[in-house]
Amino acid sequence: MPPLTPQRAAVLAFLQEQAQAGVSPSLAEIAQAFGFASRNAAQKHVQALAEAGLIELLPNQKRGIRVPGGAGRDALLNLPVLGRVAAGVPIGADIGLERQLWLDRALFSLRPDYLLQVQGDSMIDDGILDGDLVGVHRSKEARDGQIVVARVDGEITIKRLERGTERIRLLPRNRAHAPIVVAADADFAIEGLYCGLIRQG
């Protein structure tokens, strides 16, 4: 069996979690949990899992998904999507709960506290694309070279951190963009560490 894609593995983990709670979710509920645009996207994942022998589909039943085993609660995270983060020119903070998604813990290097949607292309050389959902682990501290979500004068951006002897720079990973030099009198704070991403679709 070929390895599961991250999204498909997350759907399987969600189904296992629901099965442990005695629930067989409908396609509409799966689509809502993962932010799919339609039930058809959920159907494709469910059908692929069934063909791989990881779940069973009971015919002619709205809630006809049967999961042989269980993943355990630690395998799943229910993460809030809190707004946008700029991969380009910093954008004004619009932090506020938009939705929540069930995701597999294994997708992230650190345990994320929330997700932000990327806007822009300044981090494409690090594999972070416009529209991606990035996991953010809350932290006020970061090492030189880490990818951080930072607040500069009230605006939010995702960049690589460079701590110079005299000033901090936030480095893009796209030659079309210039580094952000943090002025000495700027209102600057590290909001968190990048710990992985989800590419939907």
Swiss-Prot record:
Pfam families tied to this protein: LexA_DNA_bind, Peptidase_S24
Active site: S122 (for autocatalytic cleavage activity), K159 (for autocatalytic cleavage activity)
InterPro entries: LexA (IPR006200), LexA-like (IPR039418), LexA/Signal_pep-like_sf (IPR036286), LexA_DNA-bd_dom (IPR006199), LexA_repressor (IPR050077), Peptidase_S24_LexA (IPR006197), Peptidase_S24_S26A/B/C (IPR015927), WH-like_DNA-bd_sf (IPR036388)
CDD domains: S24_LexA-like (cd06529)
Subunit relationships: Homodimer.
Entries under NCBIfam families matching the protein: lexA
Protein name: LexA repressor 1
Gene: lexA1
